[in-house]
Amino acid sequence: MPHFRPFLGLGLANYEEHQVCAVAIGVVGDICRALEGNVLPYCDEIVGLLLRNLQNPALNRNVKPPILSCFGDIALAVGGNFEKYMQVTMSMLVQASSTAIDTGNADLVEYLNQLREGIFEAYTGVLQGLRADDKSGAFEPYVMGALDLIRQVAEGIPSGTTSDEVLRAAAGVVGDLGSSLGARGLKAVARQSPHREYLKALLKEAKASSNEQTKQVGVWAHGTLFAPP
């Protein structure tokens, strides 16, 4: 990794050739899965480059979803050590969640689905990484940000523009939130209006999906929040 690091950094910084940048982002994910916690010494540089790209208005928009997903790969690899990057990462996820599009434009609808899937993959990696090191409580300040995107997805279901991949990813985050923070009051939040309504609507749609994997995730997530104690 020390010998490869400079080339990886050059690839991540090469926003002008977005395909090169996208490949470098994919390599980061592979490195995280291979090295796991041993990737930690390189995370300051990697996270810094990823954040810089997200803030760059010249970056090709198609690179943003894999960047967001990459934060989940990093968090899953380093576990509780991701806590130092939480504030800035969560801020970026919330900012990306506010992206609005013309739903009559098929290309933009596809992009929004990819963006949301990347955001949910980031949330999943962070939640699972923290839980592995018994640091789930570090996510508590950011629960409402995640729930707001889940609400947006649930409210968009009737329009028919939400992909099954996004539905499954959203349901997965609901399940991860319930598994990680249920004892700290998320179940109580989920039973309150308006959270109860959109969470149940989303999970009902997931459980009714023709995709077996989405259906299973929906059933599991529903159980983490609404199963009797």
Language-model features, listed with the residues they occupy:
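Karyopherin-beta/Importin-beta family HEAT-repeat alpha-solenoid scaffold
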Residues: M1-P229
